[in-house]
């Protein structure tokens, strides 16, 4: 499937049910290219912002061009952030090693 983007802007949504999960689509509130099963898993999307993928500002965790290509070819890009570090667990491991 090929998605026609009107510009290099995309709409970014965060999942309210899955921490660190973001969905990038070509146009705000146009989820028709996103599989229904993915939308159900994602939960109610909360709009974050419009973002210029061709601009000078890079995304923090993913490459702008990778997102743009995914949107153009499959209609969306799903970002799943790595889990947060468990600092307590790391501390306890280090504390145990020092004994």
Curated annotation (Swiss-Prot):
Gene3D superfamilies: YcgL domain. It holds the Pfam family YcgL. Residues 8-92 form the YcgL domain. Transmembrane segments: none annotated. PANTHER family: PROTEIN YCGL (PTHR38109:SF1). This is YcgL domain-containing protein HD_1373. It comes from Haemophilus ducreyi (strain 35000HP / ATCC 700724). The lineage of its organism: Bacteria, Pseudomonadati, Pseudomonadota, Gammaproteobacteria, Pasteurellales.
